[in-house]
Amino acid sequence: MTPGYPLALSLAVSMAVLGSALPAQARQDDPSLFNRQARGELSEYGGARRVEQDLTQALKQSLSKKKAKNVILLIGDGMGDSEITVARNYARGAGGYFKGIDALPLTGQYTHYSLHKDSGLPDYVTDSAASATAWSTGVKSYNGAIGVDIHEQPHRNLLELAKLNGKATGNVSTAELQDATPAALLAHVTARKCYGPEATSKQCPSNALENGGAGSITEQWLKTRPDVVLGGGAATFAETAKAGRYAGKTLRAQAEARGYRIVENLDELKAVRRANQKQPLIGLFAPGNMPVRWLGPTATYHGNLNQPAVSCEANPKRTADIPTLAQMTSKAIELLKDNPNGFFLQVEGASIDKQDHAANPCGQIGETVDLDEAVQKALAFAKADGETLVIVTADHAHSSQIIPPETAAPGLTQLLTTKDGAPLAISYGNSEESSQEHTGTQLRIAAYGPQAANVTGLTDQTDLFFTIRRALNLRD
């Protein structure tokens, strides 16, 4: 299936004709919608093709315009089409596919950009804060903004709306939970690094509690009170509140006083049987960002020419007591589904971006594989449940490119040996600084479940807010 406008038109017609003709739970999805493995030997006639039959009827039957009870939004931070292709080629082979990321039947592309704070003109390369603000609130903002517009005014986000409508809420990330993507659902601050009271006093003084503001990201998170929040960022909880009811207490002590349950390893997470407004759950599994899955050398100048091809290795720091993204996703779903009104859950694979910044292809690939496994968990639940919309996308594109192995590229390069046994050269060349940069290329967005057709064709990142709000029938 090729994403694009003709498909969007045909889907609109199909929606009008079929609507929700079949109850979602009774529908048997055609397996050919999800299996995109190459059908034979790549060297044979038709061997590389991924589709063997006409899928028109299968696509029609997959459509539903009914409201969703639940939404699971999965974000690959920095996961542009190039990052997906790099990871697929290495981990699954040229004819392989990701059973999560590549298996959602309805696909589109969306534009993403931020705005200059002073002029309101487009800034064509967004950061993660402005992008998360865009899909969580429906408002474009400046780079660094968390839940506020270019005038620094807060806007209600999807998690707040879901709570207002009686739904359970969850937020999962492999980053510090105060990082931009998860933070946009937890707080409203004028600068993205205002994790705790110390940084907020210096960087976001108007938000600081001692100045009459709503507080740091972590302090606002504790007030927002999502049912389940899992990831890294434990270090910030050692900071002390400067004002308010909990002045002089650490943020961890405040969380405990507010009735939160805090877990710190996989066994403790597995032991949790319920999480709700009476006792919300916080999982803090690392002081900062959680350890990545795979390690390998960072790219170097002419690394593809001067260094041998390598294979990625498991990260020994990601020990068995640290939950994976898939395990956190499964547990969040298990806990949130108990709410009879449904739930909204955001899941982020955060370090695709962070490893791209570091020009580390193995790190980037492992995090994409991790996200795919989380998507598989979400899809499995949605297929069994029949009332869940699953959406997979990214916040911005990034810097990795696949180049011919023998190319003398001007940037940083690394040669890998793929599952096929073939050389794969990855290049990072958009910055002479220590960190590679985001790019402004439009992004893939794909979906499965009720109202999934609304992601097809060309949309904008802010459309995602309205797509989810409409699907869940969220009201102010």
UniProtKB/Swiss-Prot annotation:
Catalytic residues in the record: S128 (phosphoserine intermediate)
Family annotation (InterPro entries): Alkaline_phosphatase (IPR001952), Alkaline_phosphatase_AS (IPR018299), Alkaline_phosphatase_core_sf (IPR017850)
One of the GO BP terms on file: protein secretion by the type II secretion system
Superkingdom of origin: Bacteria
Residues that bind Zn(2+) 2: D77, D395, H396
Signal peptide annotation: 1-26
Sequence positions that bind Mg(2+): D77, D179, T181, Q346
UniProt keyword list: Hydrolase, Magnesium, Metal-binding, Periplasm, Phosphoprotein, Secreted, Signal, Zinc
Cofactor note: Binds 1 Mg(2+) ion per subunit. Binds 2 Zn(2+) ions per subunit.
Top EC category: hydrolase
Record-listed E.C. numbers: 3.1.3.1
Keyword Metal-binding among record annotations: yes
Entry annotated with the keyword Transferase: no
Catalytic activity: a phosphate monoester + H2O = an alcohol + phosphate
Location in the cell: Secreted; Periplasm
Annotated Gene3D superfamilies: Alkaline Phosphatase, subunit A (3.40.720.10)
Family: Belongs to the alkaline phosphatase family.
Name assigned to this protein: Alkaline phosphatase H
